[in-house]
Curated annotation (Swiss-Prot):
Family membership noted in the UniProt record: Belongs to the universal ribosomal protein uS14 family. Zinc-binding uS14 subfamily.
UniProt-listed PROSITE patterns: RIBOSOMAL_S14
Signal peptide: none
Organism lineage: Bacteria, Pseudomonadati, Thermodesulfobacteriota, Syntrophia, Syntrophales
Role, per record: Binds 16S rRNA, required for the assembly of 30S particles and may also be responsible for determining the conformation of the 16S rRNA at the A site.
GO biological process per UniProt: translation
NCBIfam families: PRK08061.1
Protein name: Small ribosomal subunit protein uS14
Originating gene: rpsZ
Keyword terms of this UniProt record: Metal-binding, Ribonucleoprotein, Ribosomal protein, RNA-binding, rRNA-binding, Zinc
InterPro entries xrefs: Ribosomal_uS14, Ribosomal_uS14_bact, Ribosomal_uS14_CS, Ribosomal_uS14_sf
Cofactor-binding details, from the entry: Binds 1 zinc ion per subunit.
Length: 61
């Protein structure tokens, strides 16, 4: 889990638009962020394996 202070800092409006960065909407993780889903890879994998994200299935070949 991310620090609460860093999550609050990311939500504030930045002075320069370049400084904004994406965080996971569930856990607040800043790295491995999937823009399409708005969450990190860990939360994406967890929710998709449960079947809570529509249209996402595990691939097998």
């Amino acid at each position: 889990m991310a620090k609460k202070s860093l999550i609050a800092k990311a939500k504030r409006e930045q002075k320069y638009s370049v400084r904004t960065y994406n965080r996971c909407s569930i856990c607040g993780r800043p790295r491995a962020y999937y823009r399409k889903f708005g969450m990190c890879r860990i939360c994406l994998r967890k929710l998709s394996s449960k079947g809570e994200i529509p249209g996402v299935i595990k691939s097998s070949w």
